[in-house]
Amino acid sequence: MKITLHRWLSAGLLAALALGTASAKADELTGTLKKARAVGYVVIGYRESSVPFSFIAGKGDPVGYSIDLCRAIVAAMSEEVGRELPIKWVAVTSETRLPAVISGDIDLECGSTTQNAERAKQVGFSPIMFVAGTKLMVKKGSPIKSFTDLKDKTVVVTAGTTNEKAIKDLNDKFKVGLKMVAARDHAESYGMVASGFAEAFATDDVLLFGQIAKNKAQGQYFVVGDFLSYDPYGIMYQKGDLQLKKLIDTTFANMAEERELEQTYKKWFLSRLPSGDRINLPMSAQLNGIFKAMVTKPE
């Protein structure tokens, strides 16, 4: 009887200590982690057609390079708060993504968003996960080979992107005389060139290759010209959330050290997409260098 009672008291003490530890840890959480532990889930903003970063492929949840990285972040968040955190998905566009992060409607924005100084004043960013730049997509046989060929031509951009500003600024600076129109998303922008409404689609080169692959249109459309901007991508979260920043930075460093960033890149840029096609875009030396620099150095 004494042994049983002793074991019961020991078990009770251990349970109380565990509960106390969990409670203390919960009290130490702030920002997004505190919110996630309280509500029991993480809200992720995704894009519907940002191939291969964040997109819908048939039925089911969003997929893509950014989505896989965000799933790794959510797994780390679950471990940090001491409970499994399922994901709630919210579709965002180029125009709605920033306000959704700022307002707290979404916890992470997992798409194809450029980090720049203007946005960094309003939101936090993960370490760089990709480096792209603005180029032009045109139909086969188009006379357009570079930005200077856009005189009196209609160019479509996706509303709310850095590409929209880049094209406007270049047009104003060099007086090219192009006509710029804005579409809701990348799929709509692609469709405007396909229909003949626009003669070129200006966005990040990798997204152009993604749209061509998604539509099985290799040989029908080409990406041309020099880079018109520099666009490093990152995952957005609320500005000033230091706990989440540390967790995200650590997650990226661990993935870089285990070469998981490299494997995730190969999965989405060199292997077959859900459509069956490949983008076939080897990792640039610049991005490879960025990933290597993330590796945690031994103490």
State the predicted function of each range.
Residues A26-E109:
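Extracytoplasmic small-molecule ligand-binding "clamshell" domains
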Residues D27, L33, D68-A76, T148, ...:
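Extended ligand-binding regions for polar small-molecule ligands
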Residues D27, T162-V181, G219-Y221, A253-E299:
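Ligand-binding clefts/hinges and TM-proximal coupling segments of bilobed small-molecule sensing domains
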Residues L29-G31, E84-P99, S142, M180-M192, ...:
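Short helix-initiation/N-cap motifs at beta->coil->alpha
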Residues V43, E48-P52, P62-E79, T114, ...:
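Bilobed "Venus flytrap"/periplasmic-binding protein-like clamshell domains
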Residues E48, F130-G141, A213-F252, S271-P298:
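Periplasmic-binding protein-like
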Residues R71, A75, G82-D149, G289-P298:
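Acidic, polar ligand-binding/catalytic clefts
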Residues T96, G111-K121, A166-K173, A187, ...:
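A ligand-binding cleft/hinge motif common to bilobed small-molecule-binding domains
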